[in-house]
Amino acid sequence: MTSALHQSSIKSLPLLGRGKVRDMYAVGDDKLLIVASDRISAFDVILDDPIPGKGQVLTELTEFWLNKLAHILPNHSTGVRPEDVVAPDELDQVRGRAVVVKRLKPILVEAVARGYLIGSGWKDYQATGAVCGIALPAGLQQASKLPQPIFTPAAKAEFGMHDENVDFAHVVREVGQEMAERIRDVTLRLYTEAAQFAATKGIIIADTKFEFGLDDDGTLYLMDEVLTPDSSRFWPADGYRVGISPPSFDKQFVRDWLETQDWDKTPPAPRLPQEVLQKTAAKYREALDRLVA
């Protein structure tokens, strides 16, 4: 197996912060170096054991989708090679897992598109018959395909907290009517086009979240990670049945194993066995191979 990177240590650039998976460094005043580590989180806890190759999969898939969907919306790409902005002894930390992107002002709304009823959307529907204020037909089951994709935004939570589903009016209050409508329309267009393509590869994209940002002129850009197993639910089409939660190309092995442990879902998490690490790495890799092949 490839060696895993739990945390980058780029000394030649100023560190701006670390998220659950990505480390962010400043490249001058107008660009960022974003390094996708192999960290994995479950139940909002970052685990000590990285998943070998995960950062490369996330980076390659994001680049694939950014190129495929560039006609819909401009994105954060700069064309600058990560290898050209770090010191020679730091090349191994960025190769295949880092990007140099435009420095944008992030819009603090998670732009979620759902084509199927699962996860928090399924819970909302069971309680209210609606998701994020959007009424849905009666009688839908878990994993039902929706009549058409819906825009179900979430308010970005503080680190370690769950994002909270909100209605469209919340987005309007945050960014104004015109920008809210643009974000909704672009989100649904990106999702629909990606889902149609993935279906030809035997993958259902049940839902996904996009991140958007603005430049100094107020132009909207697609940013951060795009249509990866971390930001989306990918289901194998041949394993899909209404009424059950289908298997997915992500950290389900990790979550399932942790559920069998005597753990209260606060740090530190139990150490993961090799089998779980290897199976999870293989699932991420399979998603990439299926989509990009």
Swiss-Prot record:
InterPro entries: SAICAR_synt/ADE2_N, SAICAR_synth, SAICAR_synthetase_CS. PROSITE patterns: SAICAR_SYNTHETASE_1, SAICAR_SYNTHETASE_2. It catalyses: 5-amino-1-(5-phospho-D-ribosyl)imidazole-4-carboxylate + L-aspartate + ATP = (2S)-2-[5-amino-1-(5-phospho-beta-D-ribosyl)imidazole-4-carboxamido]succinate + ADP + phosphate + 2 H(+). It is an enzyme of class 6 (ligase). Keywords: ATP-binding, Ligase, Nucleotide-binding, Purine biosynthesis. Pathway: Purine metabolism; IMP biosynthesis via de novo pathway; 5-amino-1-(5-phospho-D-ribosyl)imidazole-4-carboxamide from 5-amino-1-(5-phospho-D-ribosyl)imidazole-4-carboxylate: step 1/2. GO terms for biological process: 'de novo' IMP biosynthetic process. One of its GO terms (molecular function) is ATP binding. Gene3D superfamilies: ATP-grasp fold, B domain, Phosphorylase Kinase, domain 1. GO terms for cellular component: cytoplasm. Its EC number is 6.3.2.6. It comes from the Bacteria. Belongs to the SAICAR synthetase family. This is Phosphoribosylaminoimidazole-succinocarboxamide synthase. It comes from Bordetella petrii (strain ATCC BAA-461 / DSM 12804 / CCUG 43448).
